[in-house]
């Protein structure tokens, strides 16, 4: 019987370039066992709340999956035997979570704010240029 789980695992920051391959390996393990991945989010490198193995940052990955117990056990075992995985947490859920997590939403908002501020800065620069090149003084009278 399949159940829903939320899985978060932390990868050593020196192994960040290996994360896509690790995700593919875990995806194939889940899908090979007739499981379903409802949500997969790569949160990237983030600050740890406390040092783990003298590290202050780690690469975070979130999975919301629907698998049976045998596949989940195999997944957890693969986390345990992978030295690059610093920590993992598996939480049983009542149903599938498919909407974007709060961390990804806040990342998107930060990206939007950055884009807006960048656009505003460019608009300000463009607004300054025509005023400086206007020589007939029409803008001075209109203002």
From Swiss-Prot:
GO biological process, one term: translation
Composition-biased stretches (Basic and acidic residues): 105-124
Gene3D superfamilies in alphabetical order: 3.30.70.60
CDD domains (UniProt xref): bS6
Keyword Metal-binding: no
Pfam families: Ribosomal_S6
UniProt cross-references to HAMAP family, sorted A to Z: Ribosomal_bS6
Family: Belongs to the bacterial ribosomal protein bS6 family.
Name assigned to this protein: Small ribosomal subunit protein bS6
């Amino acid at each position: 019987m399949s159940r829903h789980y939320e899985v978060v695992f932390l990868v050593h920051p020196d192994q960040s370039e290996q994360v896509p391959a690790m995700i593919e390996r875990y995806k194939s393990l889940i899908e090979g066992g007739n499981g379903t991945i409802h949500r997969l989010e790569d949160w990237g490198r983030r600050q740890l709340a406390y040092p783990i193995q003298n590290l202050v940052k780690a690469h975070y990955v979130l999975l919301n999956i629907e698998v049976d117990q045998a596949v989940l056990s195999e997944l957890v075992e693969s986390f345990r035997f992978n030295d690059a995985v610093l920590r993992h947490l598996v939480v049983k859920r009542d149903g599938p979570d498919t909407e974007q997590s709060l961390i990804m939403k806040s990342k998107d908002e930060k990206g939007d704010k950055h884009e807006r501020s960048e656009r505003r800065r460019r608009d300000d620069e463009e607004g300054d240029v025509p005023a400086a090149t206007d020589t007939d003084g029409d803008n001075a009278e209109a203002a």
